[in-house]
Amino acid sequence: MAIIFMVSPWGLVYAQQTTKAPTPAIGDNGNLATDDLLIARPPAILSAEAHAGRPYGIGRINYRLQPGDEMIARTGAVLITEANQRISFPVIADTPFREFLGNFLRSNPSNSADTKSIWFLFKGDQPLNVTLHGSGQSTLDVPIVFDKPNRYERFAKNWWNSFSSASDDMIESGDYPPMVETYLTALIGKRLGLATPKQILRSKDALARTFELLFDVEALRIEAINKAMTVGVDQDLATLPMPPKIQWTPLVVENLPEDIVIEPLAQAVPHECFYLRFGTWKNQIWLQQLTEEFGGNLSRMIQLRGYQPKIQSKFLDQLAIQSSEFDRLFGGSLIDDVGVIGMDSYFDNGAAIGVMLHAKNTKALSSNMRSKRKKFAAKHADENATITTITTDADETIELLSTPDNRYRSFYAVAGDNHLLTTSRRVAERFLESARGIGSLANTREFQFARYQMPVERDDTLFIYLPTRFFQQLLTPEYQIELRRRNQVVTDMVLYEMAKLLAAGESYDFKSIDDLINGGYLPIRFGSHPEGSTFETIGDYWQCSLRGRRGFFTPVADMKIERVTLDEQRWFTQRADFFSNNIKSLDPMMIAVKRYKQEDKFERIVFDAQVLPLGEDKYKWLVQRMGPPLKQEVRRAPEDIVRFEASVQGGLLGATAQTHHLFGAVQDYLDPDIDLKPKSFLRLLDTFRQTPGYVGAWPNAGLTNWMPQLGGQPDAFGYTYSRLLKLWRLQWEDFSVLSFDQRRLEALKQHLAIIPSPRPAQVRIKVGDLANSKIQVWANMLNFRRSWQASIANIQLLNLINQQFGTPPEQTRSVASRMLDVELVCSLDGQYKRLRLPMGRNVWYSDAWPSFGNPVLPKGYLAPVLTWFRGLELEVIKEDTQFSLHGILDVQRSEQADALPSFDLFKGFGELFEK
């Protein structure tokens, strides 16, 4: 049954029942999240009004979903349609009062019983025939108001604020790159002359800007989309000379002994490459098996992500070596050492990276390597795979196995007993030069100092070294400008995809890119690239004319750049000035990891990291916040299971803050009244309130003195209280401690004391075995809430594509995958499916979701981190001229840890040794 709501010219709403027969629902698989949706529940329409305007009118409908439609509300599956397709860019928002409550008081931001507003734009002056879809649907006629310009302006402001805020919320909660939200807000803002949302314009501090420049984070592409749609694209051709390089202060290392041992593998590593050394074959097998336990991605040890690459281990797959079980059994008989080197880490779009092998028998390894590569090329002949030989200026040879689109790009070079498989010709050439002693990492004073600090004799399981020249190379004009150009190419691919979708959804007739530009869907001069590159679709993937297939671009190191545009010249000069004024030198970094086998399936992993000789001025952002090393510690309470301590320098939050010892803990005791139900959202204040712990300072109040309500005179027992936050403060002797539970503070009094510490440190963290603790259920629930939220965010994206672009639900997932170049996956390890509602509409859900109305933690759910994590100790100290980090991690391996892995961290060295 549907209900028709009629709106009279005077704004009165009345209902009329219709007899439209519902479409029977397809049988559900018994998933609790969808059980309630087998019954059609029409949304209750509370009010509606629409105001005429140009180029768009603006309307609003206030409605309420019925109980049972919680999943519809939470996933953004409420849909609004108009009989003549006149509605555009709808957005759902809380009423202003509800929004205030949601931010500060309520726990559930999307209760189906709450009153919601759906704002929308429309074209034309005739009354609107609108249908609002929940699990059921309600249809209403909305007359147009022409004579209230002030109300129109207020509606326009509310619609834009709601639209941009909704985009901000999706960006905050989602795991995926927010390209769709960025495009829509930029396009609409430009159409209507509205300000860009705060999330996109949010300024970045120096550290964030440095990180983005070095590691090509997704934020650069998001900024490129916004810039293209609001400012336009660079229209000039590259005719100007390259801007000068950044002038770095040289790193000086003195007084080194002459007898420092350097491993043979490092002799052939270029001094501008990062270097990851396993040392032995069994060490890479250990990491390989650890990776296999978590589906080929170590990040899944902490939390399942909401997306995954279309091709796992992209660069290793690109190297075109197949694997067998020989890896584990016989690899060590021919391989003496294993390493990974690279000039960058741009895995998403073509990294200059390679795998090094130090052979025990070079002739046997080389023979088998070449044989397997020939077989691979023959097997992939239909992809035009070929093997060619390249002769260098030094008359050395490099073998290249490749396909025209770069899907496979594997250079093979041999220098003595060192072998290299790499995606980059430049890395291969530098490998051969380094083996001859030209620019070898082993010959640099900084690496020798690193080996003096962390000698080869330590027999580390992993040794990672990032030299100064590695960072400097990433910040050369050649690297940065090419990185900017390829980001623009990828941005254009995504923009073109979204523009076609939106134009089709708005029934705009287009046949070419020029049509889309003229319609405002693409920026003027779209597709103009300084180097003259173009792009096209081939099958189901994008390809750049100069760089190859998206995701497998020719590495930056292999691109030749000689001329730049004026905009590029200015852009790099600004960044060079930033470093000249803020960071005059870049320091090497090194990390060492060693594992120790414990009883049964337990392992202890000890790790050390150092940032070597440094100039303190470039770390002022950190140094100014770190106080002197702590030679004492706060006595541990028996219930503490997670503890942290930090020396905090005055000035962190204000000039009045004094240097103090900050400490806190999560305790192994739960309030029996705590709400541990699964929730499909995660609010920071709610999380703090439910955390069974405390935060304190000594010998002065320090950061605990941040609220005026808590800074008053304490009562006779030392307490003050904030009614707004429901937060207690204990002032006891020289301690000031905050907690949401007064009983916890009272029990803590007897343990508050300062005792000597075994070692000085500025930061200490200690975490016990959460999986076998009393708060396991709390930690598990916290992880579930975050994962559920990320899983829902993916479906919100699909619903956004459906609503804003008019893409049918059955196509939205493939469209999202194509645009983002990732596969959207459920972060609860479920499967995304479609459910046909009683009225015939399809909606997306995950079969791992519990009921939204009355959620219960799924039986057997255990957060990924709780399956293996058994403890952590971490210390950080800055003393004299270096930062040092020391940690101990206790791990429980799975029962399959000793089995042969089917996923190969370094695809496939085993088959190299088969006859």
Language-model segments: residues:
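Conserved hydrophobic/amphipathic alpha-helical signal-anchor segments
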Residues: N772-S817
